[in-house]
């Protein structure tokens, strides 16, 4: 999954997920942000990644599995926790947030 970076915006009422592609020493946005629970972010991300046929199935599965972990954590306990705690729990994810 090192070719891609999962990015998360950690909010009080939503969590947003996006994917960037690693290009050289930087990154390039691959998807827009998808919000949970406002929308079905996981399903939207899945469709977006499936539409990019050059992304391997293994990379798609790894990204979606990590998205599942993030959404589950946010739903179960994370929304009541500061995003810095989530960032410590998932160090491979790029987090920003308001709390």
Swiss-Prot record:
GO biological process, one term: translation
Source organism, top-level taxon: Bacteria
Keywords: Ribonucleoprotein, Ribosomal protein
Entries under Pfam families matching the protein: PSRP-3_Ycf65
Cellular compartments per GO CC: ribonucleoprotein complex; ribosome
GO molecular function, one term: structural constituent of ribosome
Similarity field: Belongs to the chloroplast-specific ribosomal protein cS23 family.
Function: Probably a ribosomal protein or a ribosome-associated protein.
Subunit structure: Part of the 30S ribosomal subunit.
Name of the protein this chain belongs to: Probable small ribosomal subunit protein cS23
